[in-house]
Every structure is written in C-alpha cells, then in structure tokens.
Amino acid sequence: DEKWIRNWNIALSVSSFGIALLVGALLGLTSMGLPINDNGDRVGGAFAWVSLPVLLGGLGFVGFSLVQGLAFVALKTDGDIRDRARNTLVRWAPVLLLPIVAWVLALDFTTGNGISWLCTILAVVAVLIAWISAKGGREGRAFAGLSVFLAFGALAIFTAMYPNVLPSTLDPAYSLTIANASS
C-alpha cells in the first residue's frame, strides 16, 4: 500500500531528525554549560537551557548525520543513486558541517588548550580530505575521513572541557568537575 509506505517514510524521517537533533542539543548543552549555582543546582526557568550552544550542537549533529549518511549511500550503491548521493555530499557538506565546526571552535576559543587545538586542526584536515575524496569519487576515503573528523572533533570537545564534566555558566567555580563528580 502506497499510503502505508509514505506514512512510515515520514515517521522514520521525522524521528531520525528528532533523535539526531536531541542528542546533539544535549551534547552541546553539557559541553558549553548550564546555569549551575554554588550548591550544584540548576537555576533559571524551564527554558534556561535554551542557548546558542544547544542550537549548534543539535544542528551540528543533524548536519554530520546527513553528510555521513550521504557518504555511506554513495559508498554502498551504484549508478544514479551513487552519483546523486556523492553530488549532494560535495555540494552540501560545507554548509551542513558548519554548525559542528562552529561548536568545536567556540569551545576551543573559550576553554581550549594545546591538545584540543591539535585535535581541532586534525579534524579539519580529515574533513577536507573527506570532501576532496568525495569530489574525486573516492567514497571509501570520504566515509573514513568523515569518521576521523568525528573522532577528532569529539576529542577536541572533551579535551577543551577537561576537567569539567558540566560547566557552570554562572561562575566557573560552580562547575561540576571530574574531582567533585566522583566524590
């Protein structure tokens, strides 16, 4: 039944988008911080968590998921589908990956260190290799490059946050750190 297929395609698309947006938003939130007071309590209203880092994290995760999905489709198919996936990847990757790059750079500029900057540089090199590879029809290298980009991007985020587990946007002294989270 065509209606059944269409409805399930819509449900799958909307839920996939929603999950990617939610996971990215939560990662953006925990990496850039919450308004935590000296007692370790979150303060502010119900929407105190809504911020630019949450938006960057959500859109960054959605964008990366789309780009990595396009690379996978281009890698695993032939013919017109492969060409369309590769062409869409090459055309849209710079735009779709911009939020995740902005998120990593925002962290590096605020709390980064030498290791986080090195990871960021390696992530940028990996994504450039991935884009050039996709442009040249080397989908396997593009997929691998995007995977390396994700790994170094995540390392950049976590090394820039260290030793914080959950930064406070009110005062850095109120942040939840590895030391006080373990006790």
Residue ranges and their predicted role:
Residues 1-5, 180-183:
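Proteins with a high burden of low-complexity, intrinsically disordered sequence enriched in S/T/G/P/A and R
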Residues 2-142, 156:
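Long, contiguous internal "core" modules enriched in hydrophobic/ aromatic residues
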Residues 144-152:
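Central hydrophobic cores of alpha-helical transmembrane segments
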Residues 161:
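C-terminal active-site-capping segments
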Residues 166-183:
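Short, membrane-exposed interhelical loops at transmembrane-helix boundaries
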